[in-house]
Amino acid sequence: MDSNTVSSFQVDCFLWHVRKRFADQELGDAPFLDRLRRDQKSLRGRGNTLGLDIETATRAGKQIVERILEEESDEALKMPASRYLTDMTLEEMSRDWFMLMPKQKVAGSLCIKMDQAIMDKTIILKANFSVIFDRLETLILLRAFTEEGAIVGEISPLPSLPGHTDEDVKNAIGVLIGGLEWNDNTVRVSETIQRFAWRSSDEDGRLPLPPNQKRKMARTIESKV
C-alpha cells in the first residue's frame, strides 16, 4: 500500500476529528455540519477499502499534524495574495469589436465568441487574469487578436454565473482554438497563458490540434441566433 495514501487517510481522520469537536461545541453552521456528515461516510468507506482502523489512523494523523505545526512559522500560515497578470492594455480590454459571422457558445460560466469570417490569419491569444498558488484563479478576459490588432474572438465570464476553474478556462480555450483553426488560422498564445492556462503548447506558443479534434471543437461552437 502506498505510504502517501495511508498518511493522507490518517491526516484526514484527525482533521475530521477536530471539525467534529468544533461541531460538538455548537459552532458549526449548516453547510459545515453537512460536509462533516458526508466526510464521515467517506472516511468509513476509505477505512474499509484500506483495511485501516479509523481511531488508530486518527492518532497517527494527530502526530503528523503536530510535527508539521512545530516546524511551521507564523509567516508560512499567511494566505498568499493573488497576483494579477495582464497581457492586454486597458484599451485592448475595453475596445468594442464586431463580427461578420458571429458564433457564440456558453460553456459553464464562460461565454466563448468568435468571428468565423476570419480565415488564413495568424492569431494571438491574450488574457488578463489572477493567479494564486501558481495556478489561474479567475479569468477577467481573454481575447484573440490578428497581427493587425483586430479582435476576432473572446472568452469572458458570465456575470450571472460566477465561478470557474482553471480547467474550465483551458477547455474554453480549446474550443476557441478549434473554431479558429478550422478556418486555417494559425493560433498562438501569450507566455502567461502558456504558463498558467494552457500547458499543452510547444515552445513558440503554437497550439496544434489534429484535424478530427478541430472538427469536433468547431462543431461545438453554436450560432448565437
From Swiss-Prot:
Matches recorded under SUPFAM superfamilies: Ns1 effector domain-like, S15/NS1 RNA-binding domain
PTM per Swiss-Prot/TrEMBL: Upon interferon induction, ISGylated via host HERC5; this results in the impairment of NS1 interaction with RNA targets due to its inability to form homodimers and to interact with host EIF2AK2/PKR.
Disordered, as annotated region: 204-225
Placement of sequence motif Nuclear export signal: 132-141
Keyword Coiled coil: no
One record GO biological process: symbiont-mediated suppression of host cytoplasmic pattern recognition receptor signaling pathway via inhibition of RIG-I activity
Pfam family, one: Flu_NS1
InterPro entries (UniProt xref): NS1 (IPR004208), NS1A (IPR000256), NS1A_effect_dom-like_sf (IPR038064), uS15_NS1_RNA-bd_sf (IPR009068)
Chain span(s) of sequence motif Nuclear localization signal: 34-38
Single GO cellular component term: host cell nucleus
CPSF4-binding: region residues: 175-210
HAMAP family to which the protein is assigned, alphabetical: INFV_NS1 (MF_04066)
Comment block on domains: The dsRNA-binding region is required for suppression of RNA silencing.
Protein role: Inhibits post-transcriptional processing of cellular pre-mRNA, by binding and inhibiting two cellular proteins that are required for the 3'-end processing of cellular pre-mRNAs: the 30 kDa cleavage and polyadenylation specificity factor/CPSF4 and the poly(A)-binding protein 2/PABPN1. In turn, unprocessed 3' end pre-mRNAs accumulate in the host nucleus and are no longer exported to the cytoplasm. Cellular protein synthesis is thereby shut off very early after virus infection.
Assembly information from the UniProt record: Homodimer. Interacts with host TRIM25 (via coiled coil); this interaction specifically inhibits TRIM25 multimerization and TRIM25-mediated RIGI CARD ubiquitination. Interacts with human EIF2AK2/PKR, CPSF4, IVNS1ABP and PABPN1.
Entry protein name: Non-structural protein 1
Organism listed in the record: Influenza A virus (strain A/Chicken/Hong Kong/YU22/2002 H5N1 genotype Z)
Lineage, top ranks: Viruses, Riboviria, Orthornavirae, Negarnaviricota, Polyploviricotina
Gene name as annotated: NS
